[in-house]
Amino acid sequence: MPSLLLLTTTILLILCVLIIWFYIKTHTLKRQLQFLSEQNLEINNNNRLLNQEKIAYLQKIEQLKCKVEYQEQMIKDSEKIREESFTSAKAALFDLGKDLSKQLIEIHKIENNTARELAEQNITTASRKFNSELERLITMVGALNKDIEQSKSTVDLIKQSLLSPIGAGLLSEITLENILKSSGLRPNLDFIMQYGLTTSDSVKLRPDAIIFLPSGNLMVIDSKASKFLVDSQDNSVNLSKTMNYHLKSLANKDYAENILTTLNKKAHNFNNVITLMFLPTEQAVEKVIAANPEFLQKAWGCNIFPVGPAGLMNMLSFAKFQITDNRRSENYKVIISEVRKLLSSIGTIADYSKKIGYNLQNMVTNYDKFAASFNRNLMSRVKTIQKLGIDSGDKAMPATLERYQIVSSKSEIIEVDAENPTQIEE
């Protein structure tokens, strides 16, 4: 009996398990069937949409096919029309070209006739102008020959003038004056032309130029010339005699001593004198040295220095440098003096400004005391009177007077060291 009950229980359990498994399996299959049905429905919908799109695309293809056939027909028609128009245009151009050729031939004939007539007129006019210009040129050549003859006579006259001692000397003086003016030196300040002086023996001397150099130095220039310097012929002997005579006369004049004596009498202080013998050209210097190789040694022995324009310009450049440097030094001293005066003026202004500051401080302090007394004594009574019913009319009364105070503080002086301090030596 118990075994039968156990068997029955086991069978029931198995049946229950099978029923539960069958139920679960059935439920699962239902779900899968429902899911597949939904997918099938969705696929059918998609197929329906795709069929609709297919029909729409087929319609578009048919429409495009019709359009293509229509355009092909239009192209064929346009090509046919173009060929016909090209044929007609070709015929029209042929006729037009024929007419235009006839017109151009006629115009060319007319232009040839006109150009020939115009060319004949231009040739006639040009021939007339050429003849008139030729006549004018012949006249000008004749006048030019006369001018050349006059110029030749003028050149001969100038040459004769230069060959004379007076003319040669004048040329040398003019050259010297032009060099001095172009050197940058100031006339009547740095140099004097044709300075006349009288020696103690009542002998009058007139050097061509005197240049005032710094440190009590003088440069005396006396221009010398000879007709043999401009003469094209070889006159070495005469040139040597003439220049030796000039050197001797210049040394006998003793410019140095007489100029120092004369200028020192006029409250000037000069110590040294440099005497230059100026020759008008460098060729003149070469001629003098070629005529007398010992001329320079003789001149240097007499403390006289012969120079041409180039040598004189070099010495004037050095002189200008010395004069400019000396003028800069003098201006430097003047600047130092003016700076001292400026510093003194700044000190005076500082004293006055300090006094003004004190006065301003006193004024503000007194005003502040007045405003305090006014607000405390007078304005309190005014407010009491206004409370009693007496007003000021149209004029508004101030509540109080503003008070001011001055705060005095010492300024901080910021000292900055210069990168390259310059020491001024007095």
From Swiss-Prot:
Q: Any coiled-coil ranges, and where?
A: 25-85
User: Which keywords accompany this UniProt record?
Assistant: Coiled coil, DNA recombination
Q: Which GO terms describe its biological process?
A: DNA recombination
- Give a Pfam family name: RmuC
- Look up keyword Coiled coil and say if it applies: yes
The keyword Coiled coil belongs to this UniProt entry's keyword annotation: yes
InterPro entries membership: DNA_recombination_RmuC
Q: Which PANTHER family match?
A: DNA RECOMBINATION PROTEIN RMUC
What this chain does, per the record? Involved in DNA recombination.
**Into which family does the record put it?**
Belongs to the RmuC family.
Q: What is this protein called?
A: DNA recombination protein RmuC homolog
Species this chain originates from: Rickettsia prowazekii (strain Madrid E)
Upper taxonomic classification of the species? Bacteria, Pseudomonadati, Pseudomonadota, Alphaproteobacteria, Rickettsiales
